[in-house]
Amino acid sequence: MHNYSDIQIIIMAGGVGSRFWPMSTPDYPKQFIDVMGVGRSLIQLTVDRLKPICPVENMWVVTNEKYISIVKEQIPDMPVDNILAEPEARNTAPCIAYACRKIQKKHPDANIVVTPSDALVINTSEYQRVLSKALSYTSDKSAIVTIGIKPSRPETGYGYIAAAELTSVDEIYKVEAFREKPNLETAEQYLAAGNYYWNAGIFVWNIDTISKAIRTFQPNLASIMDEMAPSFYTEQEKKVVGKLFPTCEKISIDYAVMEKSKEIYTLPAEFGWSDLGSWGSLRTLLPQDEAGNAKMGKDIRLYECKNCVVHAADKSKVVVQGLDGYIVAEKNGQLLVCSLKEEQRIKEFG
């Protein structure tokens, strides 16, 4: 088989991070925010940890049209052609198809990693080793490799990957099935079974494998891409994509391709991953005091509080007394006080 040695990386940055209101807003969502207080936004951290795998010129960002200027500002060394604008959100399959088709036009030997822009990785060297291993597997095989995260708890907020038998290559397993987000009892069964992994939304494939899969399982999507492709890298691209992209069916890559394809594999990994999907997940990652409180801000004072996460975006003084298991978050004059148990409702509040 052909060797796909030209590594390209697609970073998905179109989400609005609605569960992180008020820190994350539709005008400035969480992937562009320094959530961890380290001086770099989540998308900048993502680019930083991918640089040892390939240069920024080989990275592509797919985002909503209205965030293009933020991407240019935060990743100034990324070529403008590599920043793809979705005229409207159509879930992950159309934007991945668009990015892959645009890459294919200039990089027929592309071997591709697709990753979210807003996850956190603690152990970057292990992350790089795992991705390199997956890339070496897909470089000469028509395989799709998903990165499965070894679960550390019975998490109900993630989808799961069930692994079947090991392939002839160490660490890489055939995928038996993808499972939706489970209830607690099912999540506990998955944890006990030992062959279930969190679906991190990180995929590795070569350009021909994904092109054939989209054509086989999503012929309508493939034909819309056929219509769009002649405009890529020309003045017409924005206009043509603006007209045709919104006609794509709203569908995730998991439903569109993963659950239908036979050649799907998983590489289980442990590199301190979190999807940073909610205030609760941020609390578990920030340093906590002896009462289980995590805080980020210039002047936050807690009295008789426990298991809280308190986040103030500017120089506000925040005083919290007597709360247990609460989120207190302030930004630009917007204030959220919400029980951690009810945090899935935040996207309705914002």
Positions of PLM-derived features:
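General beta-strand structural signal in soluble alpha/beta enzymes
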Residues: V61, L84-A85, V114, V145-I147, ...
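Conserved N-terminal catalytic core of the sugar/cofactor nucleotidyltransferase
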Residues: M1-I11, R19-P26, G37-P116, I122-S132
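Conserved core of the sugar-phosphate nucleotidyltransferase
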Residues: T124-F245, Y265, K315, L340
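Residue-level signal for inorganic ion chemistry
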Residues: I43, A99, D118, I161, ...
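Short beta-strand segments
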Residues: I11-A13, V62, V113-P116, T146-K150, ...
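Left-handed beta-helix
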Residues: M1-D6, I207-G350
